[in-house]
Design a protein with these regions (language model features):
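C-terminal beta-sandwich interaction modules and adjacent acidic
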Residues: 1-267
Length: 267
């Protein structure tokens, strides 16, 4: 992915764009002001690479001294790879509990910020929305069928900047009393062009809130105006999840403009 990077305000750095104006006043202090604005690098989640499902599985066996219980496992998948803020991630999963303990399934949306400078890197993680399921008793199994995890007003993924990278993943896990939780990560992309977009696009302020955009070049008295800034990103209001059509509902031989083509494909 190339082009200009999306605006971003992070813990250890930012990608910020602004305009600065200065009024020259002879024999007096100049008047200055600055205004930040949001730049959004397009990530169209309607592209085929963002429509594929992400799937994985994990398993562990609990041990306590000489006693070994049966395995605990997770097999989970998302309905696609790309989403926009305001949409929901449809998570389908199978949880199997052959242990002697009651376990609780849950899923969370995570953001990872990676900052690069002078050959080193620093990583900061943030957890957002949480989805919790019903307890699974020993010897039982549970199934999630397109359980929805809402995406709040977060920044898009940033993959085209050499100093800041922003990634997202869905953590699907089992809380296991008296042991380390069993978890797995399903990487996703947060985009800027919604799924099946409807014009005009809508936007929302990021949930991280406003930041002060003053820096060492802005003196305390000469720079005037509102010097706070809140990034705004694409946000889908009133999103409704629509499950994909069943295989029996899809015509394997769609109508073509040339009937001979359809006939030959059935031979």
């Amino acid at each position: 992915m190339e082009g200009i990077s999306t605006s971003f305000e992070g813990k250890h750095g930012n990608i910020r764009y602004w305009l600065k104006a200065e009024m020259d006043k002879p024999w007096s202090f100049n008047h200055k002001t600055k205004k930040a604005f949001t730049v959004i690098s397009p990530i169209d989640i309607n592209k085929p690479e963002y429509q594929v499902s992400i799937e994985d599985g994990v398993e562990k066996t609990l041990c306590c001294w000489l006693c070994i219980s049966g395995p605990i496992s997770i097999n989970a998948r998302t309905d696609r790879r790309g989403y926009c803020p305001g949409e929901s991630i449809a998570i389908s999963a199978d949880f199997e509990n052959h242990s002697s303990r009651t376990i609780i399934p849950y899923a969370t949306l995570h953001q990872t910020q990676t900052f690069f400078a002078n050959g080193k890197s620093r990583v900061r993680g943030t957890k957002f929305t949480v989805l919790t399921g019903l307890p699974v008793a020993p010897g039982n199994r549970a199934t999630w069928d397109a359980q929805l995890l809402k995406i709040p007003a977060v920044s898009p993924s940033i993959m085209n900047c050499c100093v800041i990278k922003v990634d997202y993943y869905v953590k699907v896990a089992l809380h296991i009393p008296g042991s380390y939780n069993l978890s797995m990560h399903l990487p996703i992309v947060i985009g800027t062009v919604p799924y099946r977009p409807i014009d005009p696009p809508t936007y929302a302020e990021t949930l991280t809130g406003a930041v002060d955009i003053r820096d060492e070049d802005d003196d305390q008295y000469g720079t005037m105006g509102d010097l706070t800034y809140t990034p705004m990103y694409t946000y889908v209001y009133d999103y409704r999840y629509k499950p994909p059509p069943a295989y029996s509902e899809v015509d394997p031989y769609p109508q073509a403009s040339n009937p001979d083509v359809v006939a030959s494909s059935r031979l």
